[in-house]
Amino acid sequence: MNKSRLGRGRHGKTRHVLLALIGILAISICLLGGFIAFKIYQQKSFEQKIESLKKEKDDQLSEGNQKEHFRQGQAEVIAYYPLQGEKVISSVRELINQDVKDKLESKDNLVFYYTEQEESGLKGVVNRNVTKQIYDLVAFKIEETEKTSLGKVHLTEDGQPFTLDQLFSDASKAKEQLIKELTSFIEDKKIEQDQSEQIVKNFSDQDLSAWNFDYKDSQIILYPSPVVENLEEIALPVSAFFDVIQSSYLLEKDAALYQSYFDKKHQKVVALTFDDGPNPATTPQVLETLAKYDIKATFFVLGKNVSGNEDLVKRIKSEGHVVGNHSWSHPILSQLSLDEAKKQITDTEDVLTKVLGSSSKLMRPPYGAITDDIRNSLDLSFIMWDVDSLDWKSKNEASILTEIQHQVANGSIVLMHDIHSPTVNALPRVIEYLKNQGYTFVTIPEMLNTRLKAHELYYSRDE
């Protein structure tokens, strides 16, 4: 009896264990099935999101573009190449294909290439901004990880590449002027010398047609290589290139500036300049004569003469004239040490800035004596002359007028001295003569305008 009961007990326990195992297996199968079903759902949902993103891009970008769909390693690439008529714009294709070849990583990504059209700032030219957009496809998530501009492609209205050399009537002269202007721009940024020299060399070694550029806000924008801190771009005013630019590309605002530039260039102009003041006895008389004829001039003053004549210096500026630097005590700067010469100039800059609140950044070296080392050590423009009245020598009214009559030409800078009474007395006759010859009177900044650069020497409007 006991053995029979024991056998039945053992058999029951075995059955319970078996049933439990079957239950666990059934639950596991259900869970696994649910997990697989969820993964299938998750994968389908993920694929639907990918297809939805592709459709969204297709709706946005298919018009006017040729779509190409391919794989680069593990990356799925969809490129929208813009069409000109029925042909792909080749310069855009080349830029995209180069990026695919050189920079696209072989990862499980979805990559879009496309362009956006924008105004170029030039007549008959459009920009295509080429963009790369990358989405990571990881763990059933679509995440945008990069949106990069590959650069701008400039195109003519018929879809042909527009390069910087095409903007100019004389590409060789334009490149020479561009190098000069960008060198001055870089110097003002205080870039390390070896870096600045490398940037200039890279531009010089490249054909103008290969320069990376943009045009906006009446400026030619250049992109240097190598890129250095505080110098992502070089912005040069288009007015500095009016002599060599193809004006047909200029829009209304810039075309008006261009026309104004040539109107003024063909207008007869002369700049009267006065050195060695201020002199409280004679300078006010010069100012009164200039005011009578409504003429603005440029005064190069000595630093030592400013003390005690601060109000007179302020009057010169307040009446619309320009005040420049003529050294502290009128030495021959080229015969001084570099430090001594710089001190003569910087001390005068300091006193003028203190009295006037700012500096004109114009300097005239006494006797016209200056060295390259002095010029290159100071962020000033150096103003010489091409007409010497010799008033300092003759001190004779008739002789002063005669000298000017013999030398003056369109764009001349006339040297006189506001410290001599004969000059004061000759000034009305000089003005009357020049007016009768059709001259308009301008200050140095008005005459030289965008030509004015630090460290440079100027003898006239065109020299």
UniProtKB/Swiss-Prot annotation:
Regulation: Enzymatic activity is inhibited by EDTA in vitro.
Co-factor note (free text): Zn(2+). Although displays higher activity with Co(2+) than with Zn(2+) in vitro, bioavailability may well limit this enzyme to be zinc-dependent.
InterPro entries referenced in this protein's UniProt entry, alphabetically: GlcNAc_deacetylase, Glyco_hydro/deAcase_b/a-brl, NODB_dom, Peptidoglycan_deacetylase, PgdA_N, Polysacc_deacetylase_ArnD
Topology term for the membrane: Single-pass membrane protein
Residues reported to bind substrate: 367
EC numbers for this chain: 3.5.1.104
Phenotype caused by lack of the gene: Cells lacking this gene produce fully N-acetylated glycan, become hypersensitive to exogenous lysozyme in the stationary phase of growth, and show reduced virulence in the intraperitoneal mouse model.
Raises pKa of active site His (site feature) positions: 391
Catalytic activity field: peptidoglycan-N-acetyl-D-glucosamine + H2O = peptidoglycan-D-glucosamine + acetate
Cofactor (UniProt): Zn(2+); Co(2+)
Subcellular location: Cell membrane
Span of domain NodB homology: 268-442
Protein's job: Catalyzes the deacetylation of N-acetylglucosamine (GlcNAc) residues in peptidoglycan, a modification that confers host lysozyme resistance and contributes to pneumococcal virulence.
Full protein name: Peptidoglycan-N-acetylglucosamine deacetylase
Organism: Streptococcus pneumoniae (strain ATCC BAA-255 / R6)
Lineage per the UniProt record: Bacteria, Bacillati, Bacillota, Bacilli, Lactobacillales
